[in-house]
């Protein structure tokens, strides 16, 4: 199997043959613009002279195809999608520009298509390398009303594709196409409660979307992680696999429900992972004023049938604030404070409490400290499964 490692967008770091391919493609693009080969219209009866006067500059995703520092990164995407075969890359670019014009993609960006699908696809946080993370939540279509509203007939399915393209276009325009910038998206597809393979309407829309993305949005996925993967999906994937390039498949990662949080944490820090997927991140609001996505969290593995104690040293009088969770709970949690005064006593901050999977996913506590010492957070895992403990804390000075 071919391997595709992280690739550079800095021209000086490209191998000589790839630099040559980029130079050749830029020359072909220049010639095509000079010869007006990139001027397309969605109206075949519109005079060519009028098309040209209305399009003095050829752009894609808001980026000019000539004389812009971001142009090289755009062209590299097409080259990589076609394994640096210049003619094939040029034809892909030309077909993409034609498709964008035929479907009025630039105008679609500003259309109002409603907010019915806001919970189906959304952006939240970044991965460890800085790529924005996009979540695709297929379980939302378990709602029969939403499913029919989205897929019941061809007109509705086409509208869904338009909405999905619009969402992607808006996300792409927030990327950084400068050399060395972040110009790809980390994709997460949540298959929990996803409609099964018998839902032909969803299957059709998925296949259509996949084809459109592969043909017209090359190299925009840094990684594609499927979480909460049910048994039947791997069979479905094997059916879809022939329609995907090897390059696309090399970016795929699959995680069962039991390993979802563990796999996400490999790529995304827990403070960036939404609470519903095992992380600590919620939309900032009055109910969560202490911690934000910028406050880093630690991850500790609690082995089966063991106790794990986290020690937080306190070197000043303050209010100590902490937040923690154990993914899936089924543990006991307690907290105590041990002053440094040599009297060998501890202060019970939180008596050991059994935490069930149905309890609040995240616990927040604070404790006012007048004597220097240490806070001990103890997790007792009586199960035969290892657990992931997430925690973070901050020190707030006492008022004068």
Regions found by a protein language model. Give the residues of each.
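Basic, amphipathic alpha-helical/coil surface patches used to engage anionic, phosphate-bearing ligands
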Residues: 1-400
